[in-house]
Amino acid sequence: MSLKQHTQTIFRQQFDRESDITIKAPGRVNLIGEHTDYNDGFVLPCAINYETVISCGKRGDRQIRVIAADYENQQDIFSLDAPIVPHPEYRWADYVRGVVKHLQMRNADFGGADLVICGNVPQGAGLSSSASLEVAVGQALQSLYQLPLSGVELALNGQEAENQFVGCNCGIMDQLISALGKKDHALLIDCRTLETRAVPMPENMAVVIINSNIQRGLVDSEYNTRRQQCEAAARFFGVKALRDVEPSLFFSIQDELDPVVAKRARHVISENARTLAAADALAAGNLKLMGQLMQESHISMRDDFEITVPPIDRLVEIVKSVIGDQGGVRMTGGGFGGCIVALMPLELVEQVRTTVAQEYPAHSGGKKETFYVCQASQGAGLC
């Protein structure tokens, strides 16, 4: 049974009527452009065919009633006419409540709704299950009530809900690619202006995500430290963000910076240049160059930003040994564990899967990987 059929069936069972519409919003993976988003830089993600699906219907009153199909049909009910506060027990409900509250703060005019939510975006793998949920809830209410909100506004609304209501710091990339993703394309995003450019993916190309299943320890504290180091480097150069520092200027005076801060800045400045070059390489179908840029990105994360761990480095090497210059591979996400992303011809996927299964556990303390084969998918909309 598809997610759409599943949510529609539960809607019928729980609410004794048919849903009005069913919508979806995808998760994402970032192909290149790591830790550049909060430096006003560039990222190159694509939406993936793992998604949050919501079947929904209007109500005649001002109640929002939500069923979480993935949590044994737990239910949350709250009123649009009372202050919306965090749920005392259900963490998932805060993402829904936060999106609704921030839509109200945008003066969106909508009434009550019944929602049944289901998803298959892996949680805790860095594939943006939370952004997918936020965009899906916003899209559901927009579609039910014809709200005059653009995809960018729905993405910003989700980001605000996560930052201010749920209390998790995040950039705009995850929500933006979920809202605006385009089938068979990656999306080059300027994180300062929020301008986007769709970049076609080569045909017969798989996006493979491999979860190392190494728990991401230290990620919050180290993330904050990296962010502070980047801000210190920007202050040194007298600019708003490292996005504004030309590589030639940086390399001419990097010796005047604190050595650790210089390494962090070198990653961000070079990663921005790599991301722009990668968008052009991908559009031209130049997989050899794309692979080189992804390899340089990983080395920079390992040596300059220092956010990889040995099992992740080994996982990247194992995949690279199979795909050679026919694609690219690197760690993706915040670091200290999590996932790697690889672009490769479809015909190499099974060889990569087999080789990783044979070789990786010896380098991970016996942990086995989780393997996802994805396609670049369409952003949020009707299901």
From Swiss-Prot:
- Subcellular compartments: Cytoplasm
Keyword flag Glycoprotein: no
- In terms of superkingdom, the source organism counts as Bacteria
- List the residues marked with site Transition state stabilizer: R28
> What EC number(s) does the entry state?
2.7.1.6
Q: What InterPro entries has UniProt attached to this entry?
A: Galactokinase, Galactokinase_bac, Galactokinase_CS, GalKase_N, GHMP_kinase_C_dom, GHMP_kinase_C_sf, GHMP_kinase_N_dom, GHMP_knse_ATP-bd_CS
Q: Where does Mg(2+) bind?
A: S130, E162
Positions with a binding annotation for substrate? E34, H35, T36, D37, Y223
What reaction does this catalyse?
Answer: alpha-D-galactose + ATP = alpha-D-galactose 1-phosphate + ADP + H(+)
A Gene Ontology BP annotation from the UniProt entry? galactose metabolic process
UniProt KW keywords:
ATP-binding, Carbohydrate metabolism, Cytoplasm, Galactose metabolism, Kinase, Magnesium, Metal-binding, Nucleotide-binding, Transferase
Task: Tell me if Magnesium is a UniProt keyword of this record.
Answer: yes
Annotated active site residues, numbered on this chain, are D174 (proton acceptor)
A GO cellular component annotation here is: cytosol
SUPFAM superfamilies to which the protein is assigned, alphabetical: GHMP Kinase, C-terminal domain, Ribosomal protein S5 domain 2-like
Binding of ATP: at which residues?
G124, A125, G126, L127, S128, S129, S130
Q: In which pathway does it act?
A: Carbohydrate metabolism; galactose metabolism
Give an example GO molecular function.
ATP binding
Main function: Catalyzes the transfer of the gamma-phosphate of ATP to D-galactose to form alpha-D-galactose-1-phosphate (Gal-1-P).
Q: Which protein family is it in?
A: Belongs to the GHMP kinase family. GalK subfamily.
Q: What is this protein called?
A: Galactokinase
Gene name, per UniProt, is galK
